[in-house]
Amino acid sequence: MKKWLVTIAALWLAGCSSGEINKNYYQLPVVQSGTQSTASQGNRLLWVEQVTVPDYLAGNGVVYQTSDVKYVIANNNLWASPLDQQLRNTLVANLSTQLPGWVVASQPLGSAQDTLNVTVTEFNGRYDGKVIVSGEWLLNHQGQLIKRPFRLEGVQTQDGYDEMVKVLAGVWSQEAASIAQEIKRLP
């Protein structure tokens, strides 16, 4: 009888200890483009004032779309820091690289600065192996407002959250390059 109780107790304890779930934390990498800024200073100033995300993206969980209408917010695959901060930091890094002669910052730089605000409405993986990044940005250039929508897709070549985050970062970098091209056209 004692052997039976010891066996049950051992199985119960083993079941309790193996129920541990690992949490994974993700940080967007800064995707390096072919363009490199040679100047660390410039006479043109750009303040990336904010990057906003909707409530469903503002939580800790990485978002995955499982059907046309259903989204899952992961419980164990989490952003290492708030997504809006990661998007803003990587945008500043990418624009700094792609805009020689500009000082790009996430803090106000002075009164004669251009100001960029971005609203991201989608930033997720999808059931068909694609990732979606969409939204709009608004640039205040010397009192002139320039507003552009964006919607980009990327394709995962492998399964998993690691790949999804890398592809999302690459697509976000593409949008940063697009914004940089628009800014370069300014007088």
Swiss-Prot record:
A lipid is attached at residue 16 (S-diacylglycerol cysteine). GO terms for biological process: membrane organization. GO terms for molecular function: identical protein binding. Its main location: membrane. It is a lipid-anchor. Residues 1-15 form the signal peptide. NCBIfam families: pqiC. May form a complex composed of PqiA, PqiB and PqiC. Interacts with PqiB. This is Intermembrane transport lipoprotein PqiC. It comes from Escherichia coli (strain K12). The gene is pqiC.
